[in-house]
């Protein structure tokens, strides 16, 4: 089985990992309510997708006090 001949230094390892960062999400405005959403997905605030409302948006219920 192949084994590395020399140990890799911290700087060599970190230089290699410099490109492993997670990129920013590409957000687009919703054509219905102008809030930002991910492309090709239902808008989480209004439930709109392409031609009309596909899903009813979740409404937060007020907490009842005891």
Curated annotation (Swiss-Prot):
<dbReference type="InterPro" id="IPR044957">
    <property type="entry name" value="Ribosomal_bL32_bact"/>
</dbReference>
<dbReference type="InterPro" id="IPR002677">
    <property type="entry name" value="Ribosomal_bL32"/>
</dbReference>
<comment type="similarity">
    <text>Belongs to the bacterial ribosomal protein bL32 family.</text>
</comment>
<protein>
    <recommendedName>
        <fullName>Large ribosomal subunit protein bL32</fullName>
    </recommendedName>
</protein>
<keyword id="KW-0689">Ribosomal protein</keyword>
<keyword id="KW-0687">Ribonucleoprotein</keyword>
<dbReference type="GO" id="GO:0006412">
    <property type="term" value="P:translation"/>
</dbReference>
<dbReference type="GO" id="GO:0022625">
    <property type="term" value="C:cytosolic large ribosomal subunit"/>
</dbReference>
<dbReference type="Pfam" id="PF01783">
    <property type="entry name" value="Ribosomal_L32p"/>
</dbReference>
<dbReference type="GO" id="GO:0003735">
    <property type="term" value="F:structural constituent of ribosome"/>
</dbReference>
<dbReference type="InterPro" id="IPR011332">
    <property type="entry name" value="Ribosomal_zn-bd"/>
</dbReference>
